[in-house]
């Protein structure tokens, strides 16, 4: 039976309904500061916590609930005679429900506030109370999530109490919340690239129908702090996103964000199948489509500019899973919404992820994201690339970053004519890309050529210029072939493996 509740919340959503329900069941309500004022102004009978503790708030509100008269009432085990005797001797009343949500550190840490101002949003009293209540969940109901209010109200109505399974679950939510909250604070204060303990603060964004395959369960979690493309996008149309959709959308969006020019990326199974730049969105799309008009079917198309009606009409002609762009003209959106299952995603945030993580069995690999395209670019052959060839070479390197290694991209006039990736040796990747391209001007490679065979193969297809990191002990073999065949070659000094 709940006889006494302590309520202290930053987020006032639903709190009046809960408080009035408790009041209707003769539950004594204790409250603090702004919550006390809010409840009292709305006609709820409430006791100021100072009346309980006999001690006023101090240190600008930093100390309100940190008092034995509060924590003794929360932590006392009701079945423990010694506990109950002690709190009775000390004049402490048991507290049967604790309703607390925390200062919004997750949000405030990203606002334009000073360091000291952000520190003030690190909650101390709230976490202390809810941890105490969660530890004593057999006797105390603890609520930290506004979405749980209704369920608890209904359970009390039906059973006159909250059952032990619910109490345990609510207690578990406390420690789940606190681990994320503390992780965000520790990352804020440490500012270390690779701290001793890796603490991640992510919140469930949605449950997914399934994972990569139908027999795998899945959910999507997003960072509690920061603004990221795959956290802050807006779905304007279509079915719910799947596990594969989100992974593919991430790579497609990162690819188009590489370009200052108008760009389009068509992607399938986490690999670009068509990438192009153009003077207009329509031109970029047409060129990307022509890269591989077969593989684009059932894929994702991303743009780094607003989509217009003409482009939307062309997109609507084929089956696509997703179209993602910074924005859509109203008439373009109207066209795309006619395809009710097509997911239309508005994504305005640029790709800013500073770290990549990969899970292995029993561990997590963490690395800096591959955000550097070139380092010490130098022409290593007798012949130098033309201005247009150099533009295409840079374009190719931007694309090849997002193709599974070993990766080769063949480019002509700002268009990835052939993409070869995921091969266990470089010559196979080169043959795949060159064969797909049919014709092309330049070739980009994500890593060095171990032998001269890639340059030989490129020459057979009329390639005029090559860009690659360099660094092989047999670089001279490739340079010699290029000089003999009249091909220019540029070394970048930066490898772009992708596994």
From Swiss-Prot:
Give start and end of each MGS-like domain.
1-144
Q: Which UniProt keywords apply?
A: Hydrolase, Multifunctional enzyme, Purine biosynthesis, Transferase
What catalytic reaction does the record list? (6R)-10-formyltetrahydrofolate + 5-amino-1-(5-phospho-beta-D-ribosyl)imidazole-4-carboxamide = 5-formamido-1-(5-phospho-D-ribosyl)imidazole-4-carboxamide + (6S)-5,6,7,8-tetrahydrofolate; IMP + H2O = 5-formamido-1-(5-phospho-D-ribosyl)imidazole-4-carboxamide
The catalytic activity of this protein is classed by the Enzyme Commission as: 2.1.2.3, 3.5.4.10
Which portions of this protein are annotated as coiled-coil regions?
none
Q: Which GO terms describe its cellular component?
A: cytosol
**A GO BP annotation:** 'de novo' IMP biosynthetic process
Molecular function per GO: IMP cyclohydrolase activity; phosphoribosylaminoimidazolecarboxamide formyltransferase activity
Q: Does the keyword Hydrolase apply?
A: yes
* InterPro entries associated with the record: AICAR_Tfase_dup_dom_sf, Cytidine_deaminase-like, MGS-like_dom, MGS-like_dom_sf, PurH-like
CDD domains per the record? IMPCH
**Which pathway is recorded for this entry?**
Purine metabolism; IMP biosynthesis via de novo pathway; 5-formamido-1-(5-phospho-D-ribosyl)imidazole-4-carboxamide from 5-amino-1-(5-phospho-D-ribosyl)imidazole-4-carboxamide (10-formyl THF route): step 1/1; Purine metabolism; IMP biosynthesis via de novo pathway; IMP from 5-formamido-1-(5-phospho-D-ribosyl)imidazole-4-carboxamide: step 1/1
Report the domain remarks: The IMP cyclohydrolase activity resides in the N-terminal region.
Family classification: Belongs to the PurH family.
- Read off the PANTHER family from this record: BIFUNCTIONAL PURINE BIOSYNTHESIS PROTEIN ATIC (PTHR11692:SF0), BIFUNCTIONAL PURINE BIOSYNTHESIS PROTEIN PURH (PTHR11692)
Q: What is this protein called?
A: Bifunctional purine biosynthesis protein PurH
Q: What is the organism of origin for this protein?
A: Clostridium botulinum (strain Hall / ATCC 3502 / NCTC 13319 / Type A)
Name of the gene encoding the protein in the UniProt record: purH
